Amino acid sequence: MSYHNGSIWPHDTTIVALGMRRYGLIEPFLTLTTALFEAVRHFPGYRMPELFCGFARRSGHGPTRYPVACEPQAWSAGVVFHLITGVLGLLPAAAENRLTLDRPLLPAWLKWLELHDLRLGKSRVALRAAQGREGAAIELLARDGDVEIVVRR
């Protein structure tokens, strides 16, 4: 058990995952995304800690907690939101009043995902992403304002 040697830092792991997504390394991105979502289920209140131990997985057990990790940790609390941004490829452009979803996809275990009251400038939207043949199918559920929604495949 070590603070810097072999521990998992969710914030840093997410930065790596998003870099993989950006450069088209989809399978490694999804592997890290899935691992982080699986890990967070085991922490009280779904609060992602600052770090946890990088020991091998054991069937039926969650990650080994690092005894003095900050929990919750501000930068780790943002991990889930960053990963959602990554899977949907959210690229907000408030100055242009446009929200682009760049190659949206969902991990195999996530059949659908809804975002409500997503704000862009003075506009608000609600979206639903569902498993599709070529990435995630996007449905606009609600729009308040004149924000343009662009889905790039």
Model-assigned labels for residue ranges:
Residues 72-78, 140-149:
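Short, highly charged low-complexity linear segments
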Residues 2-110, 114, 118-126, 130-132:
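C-terminal capping/lid segments that line or modulate ligand- or cofactor-binding pockets
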Residues 99-104, 115, 142-153:
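Surface-exposed beta-strand/loop patches in extracellular or lumenal glycoproteins
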